Amino acid sequence: MTATAQRQLPLDTPSASTLAQQAELHPELNRAHVRFINLGKTYHGKQGPVEALGNIDLAVQRGEIFGIIGRSGAGKSSLIRTINRLEQPSSGRVLIDQVDIGEFDEDKLVELRRRIGMIFQHFNLMSAKTVWQNVELPLKVAGVPREQRARKVAQLLELVGLQDKHNAYPAQLSGGQKQRVGIARALVHDPAILLCDEATSALDPETTQSILGLLREINQRLGLTIVLITHEMAVIRDICHRVVVLEQGRIVEQGPVWQVFGDPQHDVSKTLLAPLQTGLPKEWAERLSDQPQRPDAALLLDVHFTGASDQGPDLAALFAALGGKVQLLQGGVERIQERAIGHLILSVAGSVHTRDELLARARQLAPRAEVLGYVG
């Protein structure tokens, strides 16, 4: 970004009257817990300025679990850290409960950060202190009386399932238990927002599921707004309500998780979600050709169910419409946010229908269908 463009960005930031007009036209903005408006962040180094974020316009609703994904260097950490002002934006605004936190002085920033909890990939526990002491420490620093501290720590250790580990030291805990301590510590000041920065990336799959279950419970019981960044797409699928995709500091796609996962539009989204997709089995891919080599060659179809319909896919109707011998080579259907999302690779042999007819019939019953080629 040029120096001229940097100077112009603040001029594009909406005024208070413009924000009011936008909120009137879009009532959901009035409910936004966190809102980013034309947000930009530029770092200045020896090699010159590097734009980490640009023109970010985004609203996170109260009480939702909101995911941020993107490739390395996309700006995920920079974005999440502007919520508690650990990162100072170069331009634009961050509103929390409709209040511009960029105008806060140091005292208000301290108060803000107490209302925003944060957990990290590395648990940041003090090795010489017990579980109880690690959770209690922020309360002690804040000058909370001993009795209140004791009550709060006991409540939080029960919430995260560590009441029997209060005298243990971090070295005696598993990775999942350490993260539970981190979560308890992040909740000591009764925050309204919880930020999760790769909170499960150091954990095994089973422990990850237990931590996600705890975060889901906290979200439901306490009404917390949770904003998380992760490179694990399964985490977004399993816990988030909505997701935004970043690329080179820009938003390239956003929406409900079922929508983005079921029918990704941007190439970056498709690349990130590729590990969750099932591909053509190798033994079939090696035999694939554009034209049938024999009269009994099988046509391979790639069929997607995007969740756009409230009703699940009717596989029986699909197989009947295709006719002939239909074989499922790879894939399946799962439910994300009560929507049926599926990806099937089908082999169709012996059908009376032509290639174009088979494709048309598949598209009548599935939102997306493509011909991969022939085998045989």
Swiss-Prot record:
It is found in: Cell inner membrane. InterPro entries: AAA+_ATPase, ABC_transporter-like_ATP-bd, ABC_transporter-like_CS, ACT-like_dom_sf, MetN_ABC, MetN_ABC_transporter-like, NIL_domain, P-loop_NTPase. Residues 34-273 form the ABC transporter domain. ATP binds at residues 70-77. Its EC number is 7.4.2.11. Pfam families: ABC_tran, NIL. GO terms for cellular component: plasma membrane. It is an enzyme of class 7 (translocase). It catalyses: L-methionine(out) + ATP + H2O = L-methionine(in) + ADP + phosphate + H(+); D-methionine(out) + ATP + H2O = D-methionine(in) + ADP + phosphate + H(+). It is a peripheral membrane protein. Keywords: Amino-acid transport, ATP-binding, Cell inner membrane, Cell membrane, Membrane, Nucleotide-binding, Translocase, Transport. GO terms for molecular function: ABC-type D-methionine transporter activity; ATP binding; ATP hydrolysis activity. Belongs to the ABC transporter superfamily. Methionine importer (TC 3.A.1.24) family. Part of the ABC transporter complex MetNIQ involved in methionine import. Responsible for energy coupling to the transport system. The complex is composed of two ATP-binding proteins (MetN), two transmembrane proteins (MetI) and a solute-binding protein (MetQ). This is Methionine import ATP-binding protein MetN 2.
